[in-house]
Structure formats: structure tokens, C-alpha cells
From Swiss-Prot:
PANTHER family: NUCLEAR RECEPTOR COACTIVATOR 4. This is Nuclear receptor coactivator 4-B. One of its GO terms (molecular function) is transcription coactivator activity. It comes from Xenopus laevis. Keywords: Chromosome, Cytoplasmic vesicle, Lysosome, Nucleus, Receptor.
Amino acid sequence: MERIACVGRETAPSCSVSSWRRSMKPCSHTGLTKMNLHQDHEFSSQDPLSKCLEAKKELESAISAVLKAEQQVKENGREVKSQVQSYISRHLECLRSREVWLLEQADLIQQLKEETLQQQSQQLYWLLGQFNCLIHQLETPHSTDLVHQISVCLERLGNLALKPEESSTLYFEADVPFLRQAIATFGSIKTLSSSEEKQVLSTAVPCPYVSQNPWLLNNCFVPAAEQRPLSGMWNTPLSDWLQQKKPTSVSQCYTPYIPSLCTQDWLLKNHVAEPNEELSKPNMEEIWGQLGELNNWLLQSQQKENLECKSSSSQFSIEKLEDKDAESQDLEDMDLSDWLISPEVTEDPTNVAVFKAFDEDYKINDWLLKVEACGNCCGRQTSALEIENLGKLKCLNDQIGGKNNVSSSNDIWLLQSSQPVFKPQDVCKANEQCSTFAECVCDESCEKEALRKWLWKREGKDKNGVLQKQRQNLKNREPEKAEPSISMWLHPCRRDAQSSTQKTQECDPSVKHMMDLVETPLSKWMAKSNLTEEKASKETTQSKCSPQAETLSPFHLPLNAANWVLPLKTVDKLEKSEQSAIEDKWLLRKKAHDYYGLPSVCDLFACMKLAADKEKWLYQSPLQM
């Protein structure tokens, strides 16, 4: 009874209270047994409790609906405020662009007026100058043709306009009241009651995209877009925009479309199949089957449903649709790689072996020869050391300790052909000697000229680049013999090489012995079986006496190691002095320029270790595994 009293104080619906009162009335039937009376008594005691519980549930659902509506009102209020701000900001942006356009138009009109007035002023100034000349000539008459000039100038003056062709009036005209009215009446905030909202949602027409897809209309619930008339701005024809006509009425702002928040509206409505309705109507299983066929080429799913079975009715429960939504959500959460088919490609072992070299990492230093020490610098000049990079230098101890490595034969030519050091005081030819070669004012650098003379002097040439012994050789030279026809086609340097080989054969005894051995017939080297010991003894005695045998046997000569080693490729001084070809002056200058104009070569040799074998400097292809 306490529960009933507590519930009675709440605002319960009238229908439940009246039904409870009717149920509390005494029964009018008299033919009931005691058992029936006992059951009625229990039923009458339980009926008010169930009704109170139902009333409580209704109140709780109503409170939750009110709270949800309140929350939705807050969200809609924020949305409306954001829309108002966006609309106003867009129109402010339009006003700003309109302002910029008007300013540009004002500048353009001002520029056109100024150009027109400047042209008129130029014509007037030119005519004024003509009249000034005529007035000066009339005051001091020197010619008789002044009458014609005066008539021409007066005619031009009559054709010109003496007033400004363009007016200085320039003002801005704006319909301020219309702008104020448009701004004041722009936009409105409206709301709908619950009944009107349901009516709008029921009578709404779907969007054009959905209307063009009958499959969506027949099988899925689509929230329809509200069919709203366009505002006055968008309903205005294009001619009114061009003519800038004022609209007759202020445009009305219609309420935006608010989608339904009820989950029942988004689900498929249940309906009982009529007997005359065709059972071949597409159902939900068939719908998902069509979508699955579209995604078969993208998805290889392990959980494939049996899409071929079709149900005869179109009744589906809400639980089944929720399962479908859960499955679609699981598909959305899947990784993109699970949706795409990655074909299994078997790699060819030959291709792997070919492209393996491109995939491996390599370093450039692995292909270059490592420098062990820097003792082979040009002229034994120690290069400058950077304080920041002292720890990175490999030969720091060699340079600081002053160790002198034993120079090999390959380094001797570097020391011998080191560049001489010239002083500006000794070489400069100018009246006022320069302090450095960089400040030299001569046409050609004094340092280059001194270097050229030093090179010519080392080669045994005079200041003009001609050999000093050449004239003596030309005077003492005998007439040459007629060369064979083959040597006429040879290059002069080849002729010199051929003559030098003949001279070496004549001078070197070992080469002469070898040539004699080659020219001897093979019969002298063959052993004869019919020779007796007496004849052999005679030949030995003859061989001791004859000097020709000594020439034919180089083994009887004293051992000379130089005869068994190939001669050096360096050119002797004798061959240099006996060169017959005369070198031109421009060629000598070119050699001097190449020698002096490439200091990077010296830097290159300063970093190279010339004591190493030449084959190590050649490029070697990497080993193929």
C-alpha cells in the first residue's frame, strides 16, 4: 500500500488510474466458486503493481526523450550559430571583393581621364610654341612667308577645344538604405514542432541521386531531402544579374534539413506479404549478394556466406539487421591490404641474381685505393693541416715527426721536374716592379714568360724556341740517302724511332750478337753424326783461333746485366738533340700553357701514392658471386 500511495502522488496517466479503479470494483457475478474468488483476489492485488511499473517505465522513457531533445536543441543551436557565422563571413568576403573591384574601377577611370587631359595639354602647348615663334618673327621680320604660317596656326587653333575634354567629376554612388535593409533582414532563425517535423519528414522527397536509383528506393531506407524552394538570390534570372535589378521582395531563409535521429526510421519497415504480391521481389539476402559480387575482385574473405539461398518472404527482424551492421562495421575496421588481392608471383632465380648487385649497399671508398701515407707529395711540400680535422688524418704522425721516407725510382722524376720558384723582383719587366705576380700589369704574365724560358732552357733551346745545336747539325748534315718507298708513308716520329733503333743496334754489342745469331742458318746448329774426334778437335782449335766464333756465342762474353733487361722508355739526351722535326712556336706556347695552367694535376699527385703498382690503379670489375 505504501508503494501504491507513492506512485499515486506522481503524475501518472489518467487511463491507467481509471482502469485500476474499474478493476477494484466488486464482481457482480454470483455463481463463482471459492477458487475463482481467490484467483480474482490475487489478480486484483497484482494488477495495480504492474500498472504502476508500466507508468514508471513510461515516465523514465519520457524523461530520457526530453533530455535527448534538450541535448539536440543545444547541438542544433551550435549548428545554427556556426551557419550564421559562415553565411555572414562569406557575405563579408563578397563585400570585400566588391570593395576591391570598385577601387580598381575608380583607378581605371582616373587613369583614362588623366591620359585624355594630358594629350589635350600637349596639343595646346605645341600650338602655343608655334604662336611664340610667329610673334618673335613678327617682331624681327626676316622672311616674307609669315602670313601663310599665321593662317595655318590660326586654323589649328580654331580646330582645338580650349576647354578640358574630360570633367573632373568623380563620385561614388551607393544605395545605402537597400544595403541596410538587406543586412537587417538577412537570415532568420525558425523552429518546428514535433508534429510538423514528422509531417515534413513523411512528405519529403528524396534527393535527386536517390531518385535516379530505383534499387535504393525499393530496398533501403533513404532519408529524404526536404524539397525547399530556392532563395530569391538563386531564383533571380541571369538578365537581372547583368542589369543589376533590385529584387522586389526580400529573400526568405528556409529551414535547413534535419535528418531523423530515430533508429526505426533508418531500418527497413516490416510488412505482411499480401497473397497477390509476387514472391520474386528482391530481398535483403539478394541485395547483399549483389554487393558481394561487386566486391569479389577486391576482397578474398575467409568468411563467405551462402549467397545463393533465397528466402520466399521479405520479413526480417531488427536483430538480423543489427548483425549485418556489425559485419559491415567489422569490414570497415579491416586493413586496406586485406581488401586488395596480392597475386603470388614466383621470383625467377636468374632475375634475383641479376638485380642483386643493385640492391646491395656499396661505398665509393671500396673501389678506390687506400692511401697509406702522404710522403709522396710533390716536391716534399707538406700540405696545410686543419685544426678541426687533425683526428681524421691518417698520416699525421708522419707529417709532424718529419719522417723522410726513402724515395723510390718512380718518385725521382717528380723531384727532378719540380716547378722552380720565381721572384717578382728578378723576373718583372715593368718600370715599376710589382710586389706579387697577381698585380702584374704586363700584357703577358711575367711568371708565365719566365717559366716558358726555363722550360726551353732545360730542353736545350734558345729564347725563340729553336734548338741550339740544330743549326750546327744542319750545316754538318750529309745528304740523306733515298728512303725506301715504304718509309715515305711513315710519320716523322716513326722515322725517328726507326733510325734510333738502327743506331742502338749498331752501338749495343749484345743486340748485335743477337741479330747475328738470328741470321745464322740452322745447318750450323745441327749436330753431324759422321764427324770424327779428329775433325772435332780441329774444329775446336779453329774455333779458338777464329774471332767469328766469339761473335756468334754470347755466352763466352762477360756477363752484363744491362744487356738482358729491356731499355728504359725515357728519351736520351742524344736523341733529343738529334730530332729532325722543327717544332712551331705556338706548339711550345701551348705546352707551356698546359703545364702551367693545370695546377690541379699537382694536387692530384700530392694525394696519390706513386710507389704502388700501376695495375692497382686500373678499374677492376667486381667479383660476381
